[in-house]
């Protein structure tokens, strides 16, 4: 009887004990309303990792010009998505699932360009008396424009809290993990819905970058290419053939030379084939996946008379992705 009571007490204590480690999922964010579209664009184009103009005054001036030229077009895009970005609510749903699956840690999220900002989230974690943190980049491949920008923002926010000094570890890339790539491959097969893979051209579409950023040493292009090669190897191992497997870059902005080929170019080039697109650089659906790939490019594919045009969803708040995140955190070595 004493043993039963002891076990019940242990269960009760573990249920009420607050986690001392927090995992903060870092992403770019997106407008939570049409009003926030301006906030989102202003913060993005004021980011020195995005607009790499060293002079602060000049960067703000150029950024303001870009925002003014894009704000109305961007609002129309988000109107088509229900008046807001899906990224924040999906990320919230993912953290809810993570906290349910792994109550030993507290999972939350911080956004780079829209609330909740890292400063807000870290203040909350300080009140929770968190002793250790994992900053988890939601970008599978590393780039100064995304990963480094988010980490820089999070660490600056942490430094501003003088009395909050938790142990910090980071997960800055995870594209090479075989378990992730098996989830991606299963997502692609599910989107095919029993169609034969060999009848499709598979395009891995990633967010584009100005070539000048890569020339300055950013490893993003190299990591995207490596990611595609790993997925090709996995397809070969599992005997899942496609007509072709290609990498493309989307979301070009401005007159500068960007990474090529563009997603639009490849859709046009393979217009006589069935096409399936997987958004390889995104883990959570956003305007670039749901509007650009699934609406804008779908219309283009229809004009080109592409017979089958399929777009895979991102990993989002799927239980497979949640379990992958938990395992990655558990296996993270102490620094």
Swiss-Prot record:
What UniProt keywords apply to this chain's record, in alphabetical order? Cytoplasm, Heme biosynthesis, Iron, Lyase, Metal-binding, Porphyrin biosynthesis
- Which pathway is this protein engaged in? Porphyrin-containing compound metabolism; protoheme biosynthesis; protoheme from protoporphyrin-IX: step 1/1
Identify the main location: cytoplasm
**Enzyme kind, highest EC tier:** lyase
What GO cellular component entries does it have? Answer: cytoplasm
Localized where? Cytoplasm
EC number in record: 4.98.1.1
The signal peptide stretch is none
Protein name per Swiss-Prot or TrEMBL: Ferrochelatase
> What organism is listed for this UniProt entry?
Helicobacter pylori (strain J99 / ATCC 700824)
Which lineage ranks, top first, belong to the organism behind this chain?
Bacteria, Pseudomonadati, Campylobacterota, Epsilonproteobacteria, Campylobacterales
Q: Which gene encodes it?
A: hemH
């Amino acid at each position: 009887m004493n043993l039963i009571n002891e076990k019940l007490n242990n269960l009760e204590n573990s249920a009420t004990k607050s986690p001392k480690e927090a995992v903060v999922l870092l992403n770019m964010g997106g407008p939570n309303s049409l009003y926030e579209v301006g906030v989102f664009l202003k913060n993005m184009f004021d980011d020195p990792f995005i607009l790499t103009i060293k002079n602060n005054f000049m960067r703000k001036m150029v950024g303001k010009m870009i925002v003014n030229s894009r704000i109305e077009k961007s609002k129309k895009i988000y109107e088509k998505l229900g008046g807001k970005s899906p990224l924040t609510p999906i990320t919230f749903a993912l953290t809810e699932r993570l906290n349910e699956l792994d109550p030993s840690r507290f999972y939350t999220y911080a956004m780079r360009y829209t609330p909740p900002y890292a400063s807000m989230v870290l203040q909350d974690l300080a009140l929770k008396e968190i002793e250790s943190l994992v900053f988890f980049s939601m970008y599978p491949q590393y780039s100064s424009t995304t990963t480094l920008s988010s980490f820089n923002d999070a660490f600056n926010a942490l430094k501003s809290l003088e009395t909050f000094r938790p142990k910090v570890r980071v997960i800055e890339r995870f594209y090479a993990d075989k378990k992730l790539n098996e989830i991606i491959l299963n997502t692609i097969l599910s989107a095919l819905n029993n169609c034969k893979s060999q009848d499709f051209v598979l395009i891995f579409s990633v967010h584009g970058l100005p070539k000048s950023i890569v020339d300055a040493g950013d490893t993003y292009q190299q990591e995207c290419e490596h990611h595609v090669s790993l997925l090709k190897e996995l397809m070969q191992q599992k005997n899942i053939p496609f007509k072709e497997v290609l990498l493309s870059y989307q979301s070009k902005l401005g007159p500068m030379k960007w990474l090529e080929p563009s997603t639009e170019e490849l859709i046009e080039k393979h217009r006589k084939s069935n096409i399936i697109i997987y958004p390889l650089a995104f883990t959570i659906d956003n305007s670039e996946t749901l509007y650009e790939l699934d609406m804008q490019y779908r219309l283009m594919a229809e004009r080109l008379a592409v017979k089958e045009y399929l777009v895979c969803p991102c990993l989002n708040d799927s239980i497979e992705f949640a379990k992958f995140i938990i395992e990655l955190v558990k296996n993270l070595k102490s620094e």
